[in-house]
UniProtKB/Swiss-Prot annotation:
<feature type="binding site">
    <location>
        <position position="617"/>
    </location>
    <ligand>
        <name>ATP</name>
    </ligand>
</feature>
<keyword id="KW-0067">ATP-binding</keyword>
<feature type="short sequence motif" description="'KMSKS' region">
    <location>
        <begin position="614"/>
        <end position="618"/>
    </location>
</feature>
<keyword id="KW-0648">Protein biosynthesis</keyword>
<dbReference type="GO" id="GO:0004823">
    <property type="term" value="F:leucine-tRNA ligase activity"/>
</dbReference>
<dbReference type="InterPro" id="IPR001412">
    <property type="entry name" value="aa-tRNA-synth_I_CS"/>
</dbReference>
<dbReference type="InterPro" id="IPR015413">
    <property type="entry name" value="Methionyl/Leucyl_tRNA_Synth"/>
</dbReference>
<keyword id="KW-0436">Ligase</keyword>
<dbReference type="InterPro" id="IPR014729">
    <property type="entry name" value="Rossmann-like_a/b/a_fold"/>
</dbReference>
<keyword id="KW-0963">Cytoplasm</keyword>
<dbReference type="Pfam" id="PF08264">
    <property type="entry name" value="Anticodon_1"/>
</dbReference>
<feature type="short sequence motif" description="'HIGH' region">
    <location>
        <begin position="42"/>
        <end position="52"/>
    </location>
</feature>
<dbReference type="GO" id="GO:0005524">
    <property type="term" value="F:ATP binding"/>
</dbReference>
<dbReference type="Pfam" id="PF09334">
    <property type="entry name" value="tRNA-synt_1g"/>
</dbReference>
<dbReference type="InterPro" id="IPR002302">
    <property type="entry name" value="Leu-tRNA-ligase"/>
</dbReference>
<dbReference type="InterPro" id="IPR009008">
    <property type="entry name" value="Val/Leu/Ile-tRNA-synth_edit"/>
</dbReference>
<dbReference type="InterPro" id="IPR025709">
    <property type="entry name" value="Leu_tRNA-synth_edit"/>
</dbReference>
Length: 862
């Protein structure tokens, strides 16, 4: 038996075994409790990265652990395989998106299998396949029938050269991210999902998601953005209509001194028509449209504005309020108009300072008087109303309702609720997405594709020039069709669906991936597996993907296809993987393999070690998982990803840490190999007979470790502390003098410890442990199906305990006592302790406070 651990000799062997034996293939079993573990599936970009490895390792450990606990575990994997990168590859390299995608899937599947992940590959789905998106198209038709899918004109970012709509994140400094052309705003007919039909249910559901990080729930609540307030009408000074504003701060209305309107708001064009300012206003609006919408609302972004040469009236004070177009108000939030109260809103304050506008204090702090002329920032705390007419002296929060009632009585306002969330625009002028199953007929209008004609499949022979709009819009065989209603000539919808649609229900399809009957989901199978018990993925998906998935599940529920409201019971958002950067003065950033002994391999210059940042290709601070597996094995990569940091924290990459994990695995291998001959024919110690000394301590340590690991891994996902406890146990075993072969009791205790180590490590380093388990004589059994060890509380209990002795709360001594020592005896020992006695001299003992199994505090005075 090779005493040296060589992962290459065992890892592929066990991967073949699991595949040949269908070890991780599962079916519904009503007699067993189910556990559905899911990591967010990847886009098939070509190669997995260390972020994938960490994410999937976390999930795999939980899946294997739950399996060993006796659960019927569903742990599937698939591919979020529609998307722009495949289409860009077709444009840039002349390779069809389907071929590019499937080649990438083949390679990445091989990489994932090489990591030893316990996926049920029989349930693999790829969202770009018609067998998947045909059901998505069916759901679309049902949504259209129920009014949940609809088409309307909408303002979009448009690239004139690419002839396509761009998402906000695809606009960089007003330019198309791909071709660099100037992006313009365009009004187009777009398809939408009516997510707002479920808006209150989605918001209320956040309160029941107790297994989700509060940070994610806060982000979802804020994105939904439910606000209670008033819609206030500000009459135009010239008598021509009103400007309507939604505000949650009607308590500050007496301090509203000017009006702000989003520069791109249609109202701006109405207000400036025929005025000298018209040309400047149009130019300003075009400039603002090019600015990033998220940046525009940032506190730190430059606040720009243009006076529109018109005024409205404050409905409570009658003041004339100058009206400005600005960049820090968005047209699609609220009414797109904001009443500015510069003394009580910091952005308004900065704007007023910049343009020399009037400031009036209407909320005063209780301890001082504010002078608007000397204020250096807005006062945004609570206080008492001043300069507010009949409401002077009221607490501002109590004045909210009173002023709302006053506005209603004047006919100038009404109570209302506003939401930030808008309906989900799903139209994409792209080829590589699921076709929208609708037909446009000049006689009948918009007509659904008959269900019997689904799926509407993407044609293969398309033009991927990247110019002239969607390839589908230029494909006559696809575009031209017959109207299902009148039989006349018609055209297909050439837009495809947003790829977030595919990822909004893939977890339900995993429950029945081969179900080929309408409606594509087998209710019995879905009801057995759903909801997902543990979902794992990055915080970057906290809003859109998770919100869309929650909406889509409710929609499928209302169609009778699923029986749950929420798709994911528990959510873990793992941290990023970070690594220090290295840079050469001449060659810029370097990959790790381009650095040898601190020097650039290209020019031998000494490299500059930079700060630790998230791994990225641009910084070249990435680690190739394939290299890691070749060099150290998959088990080492898995262990390091789990040991280096708790799963929710960022992981700082350390080559020394990887080496350390490899060494520990090697130590574990060697100690088992070294004991193999001695343990032949020896059963694990069963508790018969009394143990003493080191054997008793070893067995106690073993059961304490089992208890800690099961607590850390099963309840809290504290894999790093669980691994640390196992390492301590291995070290304890190494420190034990080797017993003679005839000491069968000692060997039985050692075998119990070794088997516990192997079983506890099994979810973490499955290849190593399967091999060691077999070497110990468990041929014909698979460790993945072996129950976890159970600790005996009496064995794990300490014989002795250390009690801290305090005098007036300060530690003065410690005493070791029997674990079952009586309280009065412990107090007596504390009073008689030599180190304590000098702190008691000349003082009166008031009382003794005993904290069981921890400390005695002697309270004295004098």
């Amino acid at each position: 038996m090779n005493r040296k651990y060589v992962p290459q000799e065992i890892e592929e062997k066990w991967q073949r075994y699991w595949e040949e034996k269908n070890t991780f293939k599962v079916t519904e079993d009503p007699s067993k409790k189910k556990y559905y573990l899911l990591e967010m599936f990847p886009y098939p970009s070509g190669k997995i990265h260390i972020g994938h490895v960490r994410n999937y390792t976390i999930g795999d450990v939980v899946a294997r652990y739950k399996r060993m606990e006796g659960y019927n575990v569903l742990h599937p994997m698939g591919w979020d395989s529609f998307g722009m990168p495949a289409e860009n590859a077709a444009i840039e390299r002349g390779i069809h998106p389907s071929l590019w995608t499937n080649e990438n899937i083949t390679h990445m599947r091989k990489q994932l299998k090489r990591m030893g992940f316990s996926y049920d590959w029989d349930r693999e789905v790829s969202t770009c396949e018609p067998v998947y998106y045909r059901w998505e198209q069916l759901f679309f038709l049902w949504m259209y029938e129920k009014g949940l899918a609809y088409k309307k004109t909408s303002s979009v970012n448009w690239c004139p050269r690419c002839q396509t709509v761009l998402a906000n994140e695809q606009v960089e400094a007003g330019l198309c991210w791909r071709c660099g052309s100037e992006v313009v705003e365009k009004i187009l007919d777009q398809w939408f999902f009516r997510i707002t039909a479920y808006i209150d249910e989605l918001l209320a559901g956040c309160d029941r998601l107790t297994g989700w990080p509060e940070r994610v729930l806060t982000m979802q609540r804020n994105w939904i953005g439910k606000s209670y307030g008033c819609e206030v009408s500000f009459p135009m000074a010239d008598g021509n209509g009103d400007i309507k504003v939604f505000t949650t701060r009607q308590d500050t209305l007496f301090g509203a001194t000017f009006m702000l309107i989003a520069a791109e708001h249609p109202l701006v064009m109405e207000l400036i028509k025929g005025k000298p300012v018209e040309k400047d206003a149009r130019t300003f609006a075009e400039e603002v449209k090019k600015q990033d919408k998220l940046m525009r609302t940032s506190d730190y972004y430059e606040k720009q504005g243009l006076f529109l040469d018109c005024y409205c009236l404050n409905p409570l004070t009658g003041w004339e309020m100058p009206i400005f177009a600005t960049n820090f108000v968005l047209a699609d939030y609220g009414t797109g108009c904001v009443m500015a109260v510069p003394t009580h809103d910091q952005r308004d304050f900065e704007f007023a300072e910049k343009f020399g506008l009037r400031k009036v204090v209407v909320i005063s702090p209780p301890d001082k008087t504010l002078d608007p002329e000397t204020m250096t920032e807005a006062y945004v705390e609570e206080g008492i109303l001043v300069n507010s007419g009949p409401f002077n002296g009221m607490e501002n929060l109590k004045a909210l309702d009173a002023i709302a009632d006053h506005l209603i009585a004047l006919g100038r306002g009404k109570r209302t609720i506003q939401y930030r969330l808008r309906d989900w625009g799903i139209s994409r002028q792209r080829y590589w997405g699921a076709p929208i199953p609708m037909i446009m007929c000049p006689k009948c209008g918009t007509v659904p594709v008959p269900e019997a004609e689904l799926p509407v499949v993407l044609p293969r022979d398309v033009d991927f020039s990247g110019e002239g709009g969607s390839p589908l819009a230029k494909h006559p065989e696809f575009l031209n069709t017959t109207c299902p209603s009148c039989g006349g000539p018609a055209k297909r919808e050439s837009d495809t669906m947003d790829t977030f649609v595919e990822s909004s229900w893939y977890f339900e399809r995993y429950c029945c991936p081969h179900f080929a009957e309408k409606p594509g989901l087998n209710r019995q199978q879905v009801d057995y597996w759903m909801p997902v018990d543990q979902y794992i993925g990055g915080i970057e998906h906290a809003i859109l993907h998770l919100l869309y998935a929650r909406f889509y599940t409710r929609m499928l529920r209302d169609f009778g296809l699923v029986g749950v409201d929420e798709p994911f019971t528990n959510l873990l958002t793992q941290g990023m993987v970070c690594k220090e950067t290295t840079r050469c003065p001449d060659h810029g950033y370097l990959y790790p393999e381009e650095v040898r002994e601190g020097r650039c391999i290209h020019c031998l210059a000494e490299v500059i070690v930079g700060k630790t940042e998230k791994m990225s290709k641009s910084l070249k601070n990435v680690v190739d998982p394939d290299y890691l597996v070749r060099q150290y094995g998959a088990d080492t990569a898995r262990m390091f990803c789990l040991f280096a940091a708790p799963p929710e924290k960022d992981l700082e990459w350390s080559d020394q840490g990887v080496e350390g994990s490899f060494r520990f695995i090697g130590r574990t291998w060697r100690i088992v190999v070294d004991y193999l001959d001695d343990l032949q024919g020896i059963a694990p110690f069963a508790g018969d007979g009394e143990l003493e000394g080191e054997l008793k301590s070893l067995r106690r340590k073993t059961h304490q470790t089992i208890r800690k690991v099961r607590d850390d891994m099963g309840e809290r996902f504290h894999f790093n502390t669980a691994i640390s406890a196992i390492m301590e146990l291995v070290n304890t075993l190494y420190g034990l003098p080797r017993p003679p072969r005839e000491d069968r009791t000692a060997l039985a205790v050692i075998r119990e410890t070794i088997e516990a180590i192997i079983l506890l490590l099994a979810p973490i380093v499955p290849h190593l442990t399967e091999e060691l388990w077999q070497m110990l004589g468990h041929q014909g059994t698979c460790l993945a199906d072996t129950p976890l060890p159970v600790y005996d509380p009496t064995v794990a209990a300490e014989d002795e305990m250390t009690i801290v002795i305090q005098v007036n709360g300060k530690v003065r001594s410690r005493v070791i006592v029997a674990a079952d020592e009586a309280e009065d005896k412990i107090k007596a020992l504390a009073m008689g302790d030599e180190k304590v006695s000098r702190f008691l001299e000349g003082k009166s003992v008031i009382k003794q406070v005993y904290v069981p199994k921890k400390l005695v505090n002697i309270v004295v005075k004098g």
